[in-house]
Amino acid sequence: MKNNYIPRDISWLSFNARVLQEANDPTVTLKDRIRFLGIFSNNLDEFFRVRVATLKRMVELIDKKKSLNIDILESPNLILDEIQKVVLKQQSEFNRIWNNINKELIKRKVVIINDKKLNLSQKIFVRNYFDDVVRPYIIPLMIENLPELPYLRDKSLYLAIVMRNKQNAYHEKFALIEIPSKSIGRFVILPSSKGTNAIILLEDIIKFNLPIIFSHFKFNHFDAHVFKITKDAEIDLDQEVGLNFVEKISKGVKNRRKGKPVRFVYDKEMNAELLDYLIQKLQLTRKSSIIPGGHIHNFRHFMDFPDVLVEKQERPKPFPHPAFRNKTQVSEVILKKDVMLHFPYHNYDPVIDMLREAAMDDDVISIKITAYRLASNSKVINALINAARNGKEVTVFLELKARFDEEANLEWKTLMEEEGVKVLVGIPNVKVHAKICIIQKRVQNKLVQYGFISTGNLNEKTARVYADHCLLTANKALLMEVNKVFTYLSNWQLGDKPIEKTKHLLISPISMRNSIIQLINEEIKFAKQGYPSQITVKLNSLSDQILLDQLHKAIKAGVKVNLIIRGILTLKEGMEKSKNPINAISIVDQYLEHARVMIFHNKGKEKVFISSADWMVRNLDHRIEVAVPILDVKIKKELIDIINIQLKDNQKARILDSDLNNNYVPSLRMKKVKSQVETHHYLIGKK
């Protein structure tokens, strides 16, 4: 590997392997094991739609002898070859795990029945269900004589069908049917004996009814297998000349349907002649990812598996933060002291309540907020619209380039503007990823401000499963600097200078990288002076070479470095094997570890930050991101305690090293520590 760094895409696949480990873990509830299979599948879909698509574009440019205006650590062709090897190996492991889970389901009297195993009453049910519910959505496509295939949807599941008469095997027809799972759902509960839950998949209902669908052909043999294609989903804004930014996004979303196939996944028992025909018509080449699999595909739907399993250990419900247990008005609390919410342990109510209260408070003048990914039927947007209706000045910076949320955000933009909300969108070549809010109100004839700075999205639904931190504050120094960010977001089109340098906040792309380097250098200096020195960083991903090199210098100087990285870590070979080895772990459990936290020992007077930014080039150089120092002593201790709990995890923590083995941290007969459970106990005991 060039520069001895692990390529980011190979590191990401190693992260997805950790998700697969959860599906394989017998200590995880069966319901969650199935959910993790769905997460693994959904993750891989997005990986191919974005990362593999990008690598394939690079290969095309190289083939055309065009230069790449991008720094990569390895040849795209070599990375694609390695991806194919890893994905095929993971697909085999996935199939093995699913077979084991299926056996466990049968033990629990949950049976997934295919079209060949229906009893008489189930056959009648499936026939009637097809006529009543499914048939209006079925559009058979006869394809054997077409010069090219009709449009096939990205992410949709298809049945590829060979029809023939047993008496004349040479007279065949090929057909395709799109499985309408988006319209009517993938899973159907069948009538079954008492105490048993029988489930059939929608594609098997369609298979059972193929003789009816194609009755006019008089065929008596049908061979049907599923496949799906994944398409390039990148939006190329530079190609849309003459359009404004919103029009470019809108057209880019529509153009996704024209994306080239980057992956073809199929049932390995598919008719060989039909398989070759599809590969030829889809213009798939040796560079394409053609992946054989089992009978079931699009496992992402299994994240919504029917609720037929009763589990002993259900996920604990979020609880109120102690500051809000007495239903006190949120603004009253924040104006007196800082509060930090830790999701999903704490409930999300204070964030929604803060906005709802502001919407109805006669003394509130304005609300400024950033939005990246929002919940459907968003309570946040509802509160902001209510505020605008009540005469408040509401400004929302809505990031239209949030990948796969572009269409939803365009709809939110239209809705909010119709209600009088000022919606700002689009800075060229920059995404606004910071999670910040400021509310201004009058208190006793004085203007005061309060708001929040968060690591997670304004999304009350994902807040139930994403582990994030949100600082509610009225600190004047912090909010004055947050205001500078909003001023820039509002006025950049007027040619305003970039955000001024700040004393407290670390802001990308202005100061964050240099500030982090300075903080690392301080620890190096302390180590050389003989002081205990330590850096602890928790991130989703760490792939920035400059900061990795800086950490390498810190290790050589004797600084203890702890990394808690959920996803990508492009570790330099040997960093974990040096005299002062790096301690790098990844925690994958029932909650998705989404928070970014930085702790610098600072001779015992720790400097602690929460941040919206990962340590990646895109976050540090091409996004507006905000990291905030934790100034409140109690909150600082609380956050350090939570991170220390995670560093002690010996149940769900994996060791991150350049071998990518994902070995679990050994418990070595010590007390078993499952950090998400321990964090729940720690926080629920707080007063």
Please describe what each predicted stretch is:
Residues M1-I535, K553-A557, L569-K687:
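N-terminal localization/anchoring segments of enzymes in phospholipid and broader phosphate metabolism
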Residues N377, I546-L547:
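Low-complexity, intrinsically disordered short segments enriched for Gly/Pro and polybasic residues
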Residues L547, L551-K553:
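Polyanion-binding catalytic cores of nucleic-acid enzymes and NTP/SAM-utilizing transferases
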